[in-house]
Amino acid sequence: MIESATSNPFCSRFLQPGRIPFCFPGTESISQLADRIRAPLGKGAPRGNSAQAALRLSIVGPHGSGKSTLLHQLCQELRGNRQSNCLSDSGLVVLHSSSNKLAALRAILGRIHRDQWCLIDGYEQIPRWAQFLLVAWAKPRGVALCVTAHRLPWMFQTLWETRVDAHVESHVIECLLANVAAKDGGPSSVISDLLQSPHWAVSRQKHQENLRESLFAMYDWWQATVDDFPRSR
C-alpha cells in the first residue's frame, strides 16, 4: 500500500483546464500557437482572403482530449500572464449545453468590440445563425477568433488537433502526481502502479480518447490504494 500526505490528485479541482501544462508531441509551443493568433495584427501580415481566413482558428478534438486546457493556456499567453485565471479575468468565454446562449452571445460580441482576439471554449454550443453573426462581426474589425470544437467549424482553419496517446497519458499523470511524497519508491512508483493497474486499463478501454473521464475514474482507485490522505473531494 502506497502512503501519501497529499489529498487525492484526481479530485476535480486538480483537473480544471490550465492546471496541467498542455503536452506537445514535438517542438511546438504555446508561444508559437499564440503567434498564429497574433499574426494578422502585426506588421507584414498578408492581405486579402488568406489573411481573413487566418483570423478564424479552431482547436479540434474529441471530448476530454485537452482542447480546453490548450485554449486556457493560449489565453494566458496572449494576455502575457501565464498565472492568470482566464475565467475570472474574462479572458475567454466558456460555453456548456446549459449556458444561456443569448447572454453568451452578448458577452462574445462585447469582446469582439473591444479586444484584438476572442477565445471561445465550446463553439458548437452557439446556434449556427449566431456563428454567422460572430464571423460577420469580427471580420471587418480584424478580430481573431480562436475556438474549441469537436469538428472543424465552417469558415475556420485548424490551429491544433488534440490527440491522446501513451506519451500524453504519462505526461498528465506525472504532472498530477508531481507532489506526491510516497514512501514506497516516490512518485515514479505511484505512476508505475497506476499505469499498470487493471483499473486504469479498464478505464482507458471504456473512455478511449476521453482522458479526462479516465482521470476522474481514478479517484476511487487512489482512495482504495493510497493511505493517509484527506478523504474529501
Label for each model-derived stretch:
Residues 1-53, 217-233:
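A short, basic N-terminal segment
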Residues 81-113:
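AAA+/P-loop NTPase substrate/partner-engagement loops
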Residues 98, 108-137, 144, 148-151:
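Conserved P-loop NTPase "ATPase switch" module shared by AAA+ and STAND
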Residues 152-164:
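Short regulatory helix/loop adjacent to the ATP-binding pocket of P-loop NTPases
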Residues 165-197:
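Conserved small helical "lid"/interfacial subdomain of P-loop NTPases
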Residues 192-233:
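Amphipathic alpha-helical "lid/sensor" segments that cap RecA-like P-loop NTPase cores
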